[in-house]
A protein has these predicted regions:
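A generic structural micro-environment signature
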Residues: 269, 710, 720-723
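Short, charged, amphipathic alpha-helical segments
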Residues: 683-691
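A glycine-biased, small/acidic residue-tolerant capping/turn segment at secondary-structure junctions
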Residues: 701-717
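Extended, well-ordered protein cores
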Residues: 2-270, 278-503, 507, 511-523, ...
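C-terminal accessory extensions/subdomains outside the catalytic/core fold
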Residues: 720-741
Length: 741
């Protein structure tokens, strides 16, 4: 993107971070303007991505460019400097709600066809399917991941410890996984020798062949693997664990990643729904089929589809659903007051966030009466479930961790170029018949094959060699910079990991590792090793694949800091650019609900502050813009003062919220710029701003807090009304006058 000035791209996303952007971005643009830095935006919100992908259905004024595709290309260039805020990884219900809202605003978009029969329906469904799930991150992540808690954040957590639930040695909470016929148990893996093309073929019991995925390119030295989740074994697992939860008197919960693993995990979730509510499906299954109920969307889909039935028929089915709770173990609740259970929609309980929350709360989740209770956490596949059981066992023996003394676990994650499971969606298939699935190369040789039954889930993953080399290098770099042990979380008894271990052992000698402690441990042992060190106040770098990158950058920050949104998340892009992610949390729909109810936004923008400082520092290094480094250093100082003076948003209406926190950041940033002695021009420019912001503190905070209370009109949920939200998020005329001057 050739421009005269170096450009930072600030992404427009969804829900709470999107609202916060209306308040914070004008401050960022104002503070950076005189330093020759462009801060531009690109809309990668769910609504924006839908609009961009259906130009043929829209009129000229409604059409917008495909910002995500543009940023994907930018990420491959040395100029890339992208600040990426959390966005919605859409489930089908969220996708449908967005389409409905856009249609109501005059966008003549097609409905999402759950059953695609015609060619047009198939094309529409294919386009929407590309937008759902975690469609954004894999496009932008052209590098590996470096995530850690900045010192200022860690020190704040030690001085202001978050609550940690006490643990009992008698806790009945535990993780349950399959012991056979899951992805872990069936995995086969091979390293490619020489670039080739492969296709994925199904061969039926009768010998008939069907191409599941046409030929696609593989690079030399690429690792590929294939695994199968057996449907019959999965269903038997759910039946056994549901009975066991009842017998043990614990809550039943299911922890999946249906947003990212958008092909496999909703299907697994659907099987759990059908087994738990089996009496209702046995009685009303035919009607549900006629109504188009999709269990993969959760039991909420039953409620949605029966809503239009005659009142007595609807009430009879609802009574049957309620009766299930009399005979089955109680479900963990998402919202006890509204009766929303773990099985309501697949996007409500997401393993990387839900398990750490449970572990922080004495290993308990909420029951239907709104009380915390010991819980069985079902994580069907064994690949990574042991890490959570290890934390449960450790806390039962040693008690809860102490945030004032505990160590940290920064992460170096293998992520680039759609590595491993998180790039497998287009190679994941639900089999319609029994037979074999084969990965066949250009010469007709079968590289990998798996026996399958009807309904099984087949998955192929890949990871390229260049990202692995970059990952090993980043691990050594971080170990050297921080002086703490680095542990590769790889299991030699797992097919894919065995291939990776060979590469790690081959590439490590290429770097200077003298004096560094570098280990390779299976996830269970790596967790145990790290937990002992955490308890002793010691730090340990976790060097992991893509899924554990995701899981651990929630698990340890939530235990250490109370949230994963306060992590510094840097993606050094492989072609020299930088991607700066603002925390590892989601987009906080409940925060938006509070704004709609009482105009109070409790979103904490600390992740944005940290990412912006890292982005400015990167810009300074790459372009030689010395002012950018001064801005970054001053912002770091301001963030430290912001934390020390506890200016993060309150949860309560009438108190400081997101907007007030932005005022304090601006005031402290201006002060730090005015006081620094590296750049006299910036010091002079911000001296007046700093004194004006400081002197007007009382007036500005009053204007910001007094705006709260009445309902906040956003003019939409997925597609916000710019003018309305800008005015709502910038209610202080005093502050605006200084920022816009």
């Amino acid at each position: 993107m050739p421009t005269e000035k170096p450009t930072i791209i600030y992404t427009i996303t969804d829900e709470a971070p999107a609202l916060a952007t209306y308040s914070l971005l004008p401050i960022i643009q104002s503070f950076t303007a005189s330093s020759g830095i462009n801060v531009d935006t690109r809309d990668i919100s769910l609504a924006g991505r839908i609009i961009a992908n259906f130009p043929d259905y829209l009129n000229e004024e409604q059409r917008i460019g495909d910002a995500l595709a543009e940023l994907g290309e930018l990420a491959k260039t040395p100029e890339a400097n992208i600040i990426k805020l959390p966005n919605i990884s859409a489930s089908v219900p969220q996708l449908q709600a967005t389409i409905k809202e856009l249609q109501s605003k005059g966008y003549a978009l097609p409905n999402y066809p759950e059953e695609a029969n015609t060619d047009e329906e198939k094309a529409v469904k294919a386009t929407y399917d590309k937008i759902k799930g975690s469609a954004v991150n894999p496009v932008l992540r052209e590098g590996n991941s470096d995530r850690r808690a900045p010192l200022s954040v860690k020190n704040y957590a030690k001085k202001n410890p978050h609550s940690m639930g006490a643990w009992s040695a008698d806790s009945k909470s535990h993780v349950s996984s399959m012991d056979d016929k899951d992805f872990f148990g069936s995995e086969k893996s091979v390293t490619i020798e020489g670039a080739t093309e492969v296709s994925i073929e199904f061969v039926g019991k009768d010998g008939a062949k069907k191409t599941l995925k046409p030929a696609f390119a593989l690079q030399d030295k690429e690792i590929i693997d294939a695994s199968v989740m057996n449907k019959a074994a999965l269903v038997a697992f759910f039946e056994k664990e549901i009975a066991s939860a009842k017998e043990q008197g614990v809550l039943l919960s299911l922890h999946m990643k249906a947003t990212m693993m958008k092909v496999s995990d909703p299907v697994i979730f659907g099987h759990a729904v059908k087994v738990y509510y089996k009496d209702v499906f046995a009685k009303h299954g035919q009607l549900f089929n006629e109504l188009g109920v999709d269990v993969n969307n959760g039991i909420g889909d039953v409620y949605a589809k029966i809503a239009a039935l005659p009142q007595d028929q609807k009430q009879a089915i609802e009574a049957d659903l309620q009766a299930v709770y009399e005979t089955q173990p109680p479900l963990a609740m998402v919202d006890s007051d509204r009766g929303i259970t773990n099985l309501h929609v697949p996007s409500d309980i997401i393993v990387d966030a839900s398990m750490p929350a449970m572990l922080r709360s004495s290993g308990q989740m909420w029951d239907p009466k709104g009380k915390q209770k010991d819980t069985k956490a079902m994580i069907p596949d064994r690949s990574y479930a042991s890490i959570y059981q290890a934390v449960i066992d450790f806390c039962k023996e040693n008690g809860a961790f102490d945030p004032t003394t505990m160590g940290s676990v920064p992460n170096v994650g293998l992520m680039a170029q759609k590595a491993e499971e998180y790039g497998s969606h287009d190679k994941t298939f639900i089999l319609e018949a029994a037979g074999q699935v084969q990965v066949v190369d250009a010469s007709g040789s079968v590289l990998l094959e798996q026996d399958v039954e009807e309904g099984d889930i087949f998955r192929m993953c890949q990871v390229k060699d260049a990202p692995i080399q970059d990952w090993v290098k980043l691990a050594v770099t971080r170990a050297r910079a921080s002086g703490v042990p680095a542990v590769f979380w790889l299991d030699a008894s797992r097919a894919h990991d065995a291939q990776l271990i060979e590469k790690v052992e081959a590439y490590l000698p290429e770097y200077d590792t003298d004096g560094l402690e570098i280990k390779i441990l299976a996830p269970l042992e790596a967790t145990q090793y790290s937990l002992v060190r955490i308890k002793e106040g010691l730090d340990t770098i976790s060097v992991t694949g893509n899924v554990l990158r995701d899981y651990l950058t929630d698990l340890f920050p939530i235990l250490e800091l109370g949230t994963s949104a306060k992590m510094l998340s840097i993606v050094p892009l492989m072609n020299g650019g930088g991607l700066f992610e603002t925390g590892a949390g989601g987009s906080a729909p409940k925060h938006v609900q509070q704004v709609e109810k009482e105009n109070h936004l409790r979103w904490d923008s600390l992740g944005e502050f940290l990412a912006l400082a890292a982005s400015l520092e990167h810009l300074s290094v790459v372009t030689g813009n010395a002012k950018a480094q001064v801005l970054a250093d001053a912002l770091d100082k301001a963030t430290g003062e912001f934390l020390d003076k506890n200016k993060s948003p309150s949860r309560r209406v009438g108190e400081l919220d997101n907007r007030g926190s932005h005022y304090y950041l601006a005031a402290y940033w201006a002060k730090a710029l005015a006081e620094q002695t590296v750049d006299a021009d910036l010091a002079a420019e911000f001296a007046g701003v700093a004194s004006q912001l400081a002197e007007s503190e009382e007036a500005i905070v009053a204007e910001l807090n007094n705006a709260q209370g009445p309902a906040g009109d956003l003019g939409g949920y997925y597609l916000l009304d710019d003018a309305l939200v800008s005015s709502l998020m910038r209610p202080s005329s005093t502050l605006n006058a200084f920022i816009d001057a």
